[in-house]
From Swiss-Prot:
Transferase found in the keyword field: no
GO biological process: polysaccharide catabolic process
Protein name as catalogued: Glucoamylase GLA1
Active site: D234, E237
Species per Swiss-Prot/TrEMBL record: Saccharomycopsis fibuligera
Assigned EC number: 3.2.1.3
One annotated GO molecular function: glucan 1,4-alpha-glucosidase activity
């Protein structure tokens, strides 16, 4: 299979650079090397996606430190956000970005029969997580109440604390890490007979899955339980307050870990996880959180900023969070999957805004290049005018793909109501062709397997493809993805080879392939 070829190619180009000795000099160790003899073919989307899956995986793995990998200017298990060391300097490991990266690695692991090369990379990440948890930092220390230091957002690549000014704390990181590692434990049990792959290696801080649960997952969960109702900075590291994305990933981490805690006879903690997850679910959906705003009929990412009249609340985080917390084919008690009408309306309104906001989108009638939020002014090198982000655009493609996958795989109907009507009627199907008397105030159910259902499903896939076409039009010739594309010219800008960008595209291609396999 192509994955095996990719791993062979990847191992063959392992960098000969030595590990750093003495004070960290990150600029002395560039880690970027373009995919060998590859140039993007822009003539056909299908051909591009077929080839790009391996290319995006290559660039994602290139930014992870592990013995079989190319990047070795870092402790094994380190994930750099980007090789970029200036304008902007992203040569650090973020707790959030690393966890999201390894969620993508886990998708590949699960689709490739527990590939041991990837499993080793995951376990090195788990080992590094143990050490980072216990590294005192400006946010606090492991020994503080509820492990306060776990809210530290980023560290140097050698595992030392970053002590510069930053937006602290960031409470989504521990939740995402706990979820990613918990998911790996389930993979180990279901795909590898409960056996870890690094237990005989030196300098590893665990010898069993129970060690991982008790010493790495549980502290992160204790942090979430202790601080879920405290303010922190958002995933974009700009605003302190309450955040839909943060609360959603926290709820996911707690709910997902209940059965794991029970499996290790930690019943009392499992009960605490369950009760706190239920409290968070109510907080997410109710008036206390303020995230579901019926006055504007969309999810508000940061209600505090809406109250201050500094933002309208539209944000790509309101669909990125649902995608990260609802893996395909997974039965989940976490609310706000992408079929939620408020998630879809938020997605639709951001798309409508960005179509007018970014002139690069004048070339597109359906999908578009999507930014973080309408009021964004960060261009990667200071503040002026915000740009579309490749990762936000790749996640935008995933939304319609997941709608189709979930409906088809479970033979579910598709329900259109007055909240999500505008999205479906404008971009997916003229609802008057289904029911000539249909009004936007009505609710209509499109029955699974019907001709109308198949039309809607096909059109949703085509709509998702229109976002990937935007990426094809603006991706670098070597298949790497920057953080942003210029709002006017479409040229790549900001940090190059952003790990999260490659991961988001890889997940979009994976989801699209699974939808196609259902046809």
């Amino acid at each position: 299979m192509r994955f095996g070829v990719l791993i062979s190619v990847f191992v063959a180009i392992v960098s000969a650079l030595p590990l750093q000795e003495g004070p960290l000099n990150k600029r002395a160790y560039p880690s970027f090397e373009a995919y060998s003899n590859y140039k993007v073919d822009r003539t056909d989307l299908e051909t591009f996606l077929d080839k790009q899956k391996d290319v995006s995986l290559y660039y994602l793995l290139q930014n992870i430190a592990y013995p079989e990998g190319q990047f070795n200017d870092g402790v094994p298990g380190t994930v750099i956000a980007s090789p970029s060391t200036s304008n902007p300097d992203y040569y650090y490991q973020w707790t959030r970005d690393s966890a999201i990266t390894f969620l993508t690695v886990l998708s590949e692991l699960e689709d490739n029969n527990f590939n041991t090369t990837l499993a080793k990379a995951v376990e090195y990440y788990i080992n590094t997580s143990y050490n980072l948890q216990r590294t005192s930092n400006p946010s606090g220390s492991f020994d503080d109440e509820n492990h306060k230091g776990l809210g530290e957002p980023k560290f140097n690549t050698d595992g030392s604390a970053y002590t510069g000014a930053w937006g602290r704390p960031q409470n989504d990181g521990p939740a995402l890490r706990a979820y990613a590692i918990s998911r790996y434990l389930n993979d180990v049990n279901s795909l590898n007979k409960g056996k870890l792959v690094l237990t005989d290696s030196g300098d590893i801080n665990f010898s069993s899955t129970e060690d991982i649960y008790k010493n790495i997952i549980k502290p992160d969960l204790e942090y979430v339980i202790g601080y879920w109702d405290s303010t922190g900075f958002d995933l974009w590291e700009e605003n302190q307050g309450r955040h839909f994305f943060t609360s959603l990933v926290q709820q996911k981490a707690l709910a997902y870990a209940v059965d794991i805690a029970k499996s290790f006879d930690d019943g009392d903690f499992a009960n605490t996880l369950s009760s706190t997850a239920s409290t968070l679910e109510s907080y997410l959906s109710g008036s206390d959180g303020g995230f579901v705003n019926t006055d504007v009929n969309h999810i508000v990412e940061n209600p505090d900023l809406l109250q201050q009249n500094s933002r309208q609340g539209l944000d790509s985080a309101t669909y990125i969070g649902p995608l990260l917390t609802h893996d395909i084919g997974e039965s989940s008690s976490t609310p706000f999957d992408v079929d939620n009408e408020y998630v879809l309306q938020s997605y639709y309104l951001l798309l409508e805004d960005n179509k007018d906001r970014y002139s690069v989108n004048s070339a597109y009638s359906a999908g578009a290049a999507i930014g973080r939020y309408p009021e964004d002014v960060y261009n990667g090198d200071g503040s002026s005018e915000g740009n579309p982000w490749f990762l936000a655009t790749a996640y935008a493609a995933q939304v319609p793909y997941k709608l189709v996958y979930d409906a088809k795989s479970a033979s579910n109907d598709i329900t259109i109501n007055k909240i999500n009507y505008d999205f479906f009627n404008k971009y997916i199907v003229d609802l008057s062709t289904i029911n000539s008397g249909y009004q936007s105030s009505d609710s209509v159910t499109i029955k699974s397997g019907s001709d109308e259902f198949n039309t809607v499903a096909d059109n949703l896939v085509t709509f998702g493809d229109s976002f990937l076409q935007v990426i094809l039009d603006h991706i670098n010739d070597d298949g790497s993805l920057n953080e942003q594309l210029n709002r006017n010219t479409g040229y790549s800008t900001s940090a190059y080879s952003l790990t999260w960008s490659s991961g988001a595209l890889l997940e979009a291609i994976r989801l699209r392939n699974k939808v196609k396999a259902l046809a």
